[in-house]
Amino acid sequence: MNYLPFVLQRRSTVVASAPAPGSASRIPESPTTTGSNIINIIYSQSTHPNSSPTSGSAEKFSWQQSWPSRTSAAPTHDSGTMSINTTFDLSSPSVTSGHALTEQTQVVKEGWLMKRGEHIKNWRQRYFVLHSDGRLMGYRSKPADSASTPSDFLLNNFTVRGCQIMTVDRPKPFTFIIRGLQWTTVIERTFAVESELERQQWTEAIRNVSSRLIDVGEVAMTPSEQTDMTDVDMATIAEDELSEQFSVQGTTCNSSGVKKVTLENFEFLKVLGKGTFGKVILCREKATAKLYAIKILKKEVIIQKDEVAHTLTESRVLKSTNHPFLISLKYSFQTNDRLCFVMQYVNGGELFWHLSHERIFTEDRTRFYGAEIISALGYLHSQGIIYRDLKLENLLLDKDGHIKVADFGLCKEDITYGRTTKTFCGTPEYLAPEVLDDNDYGQAVDWWGTGVVMYEMICGRLPFYNRDHDVLFTLILVEEVKFPRNITDEAKNLLAGLLAKDPKKRLGGGKDDVKEIQAHPFFASINWTDLVLKKIPPPFKPQVTSDTDTRYFDKEFTGESVELTPPDPTGPLGSIAEEPLFPQFSYQGDMASTLGTSSHISTSTSLASMQ
């Protein structure tokens, strides 16, 4: 990866779909975040163009004769690979309480396998059971029987109908890979055993089941239950169900002529960032002259990348929350091919940017930022929301120097004290031990992230780091955090409490949640009421000369001209329609007080395509 030439390096977010879909609740995307890719860092764009479009539902593939080149040292194909032009159905349904077998279903083979993560390349031992109906089910421990095993133990559920198998000896000896294509992307599931005999037994068993299912035209069983719809991704939702998911509060278009916000209501000033999903543009609302950051996303890419769930979550959280240290939403609307979020614009830069230039912050400055972060997270927790992706790149400063938490795509709703989730997501360097250890986790996961960012501020480095993710995860799980000699005992005690491996023993991990942290001696000088009211002056004020000063944004983008070109030259720019796939997406807040009667509101349905 090409990172900014700073002391710190940007960390890429890893996201996963529904609990235990396909890969131990790990269908992560491995995004590549560069220093110039501001859209993925600033305004809630936590997914990236290099994501693998895996999903929690059945993934249908068609084999092709020519395989795209992936590495210079191509793996050796097994001599017995399946014939081409077959269908490969690698499904990853959600965990259910059990999968009762039919009378015709039999266990073909079972035993321990090492399974490799698709993007975070660590190996995990799983007990797999191959059934005659094509299901390859992976468990944390050996199940008594698959019909009565609790969902906590079922981590993988693949269907191998029509799969192609390759045997390789990299990166571990006795490895075999199940491969297929989704869209134009190669999808792989990688396993390893201890001997050539074991590998031969597994590959032959899988190949025989796969071939038989194709020969007889059987369709592998895939449970339809979804136990966690908040995290489920696009491919698991039928179009009619998806439409319901996008029904959100707000003013929507109707035949009575109710005014709507469109792209025509804004004057576009500068490009703040761009990526595969779209652009973030600094704009001025014509009726009020107020500045906003408008994030314009491509629907087609959101659907193809299976990012509907994260977009839905982001939309819900933005609409339902109101806190001085969280980015806020003014409007959301859509064109025929775009989703548009009009969001609060802050131009003080990322904490990552500032810390990269200053190397460390003083304890007083860290205390101030930490207090505002803790206040924001405590508010989210009070609303039943956990954040799950705390890192310096997602922490912005406004023009006065106050914290603004951005990027809500990985939030999890309906998690209060005692309630847990198990989706594997976050950023590798910030992952809590309980997430890495496949345990259910709750609110305490955010306090681990708080400990990591505050450690970075005070110490100028991550508490645990290694370029090799296997080593990194081992450090997070077993290594004790070390502190430099020059920090105070209060700071050391706070960080040690936040970075406790056991979430039950972690500071803030109890029923009192945020209150336990606020009562720590390190924050003795903080008046929490005054903090929320912004009565405490920030220790640093960004050096911006005006609201349109974009010095903390990448000049690669801010120097670009803003071009919005309708595909139909005769159609007005920015006209919108609530098409069936995304009905009632619009959220327009107190529109009547801001648009004014002179605003031109278009009612046609032509597209607004961005160059």
UniProtKB/Swiss-Prot annotation:
Its EC number is 2.7.11.1. SUPFAM superfamilies: PH domain-like, Protein kinase-like (PK-like). It is found in: Cytoplasm, Cytosol; Cell membrane. Phosphorylated and activated by Pk61C/PDK1. Phosphorylated on Ser-586 by the TORC2 complex. Coiled coil: none annotated. The keyword Amino-acid biosynthesis does not apply. This is RAC serine/threonine-protein kinase.
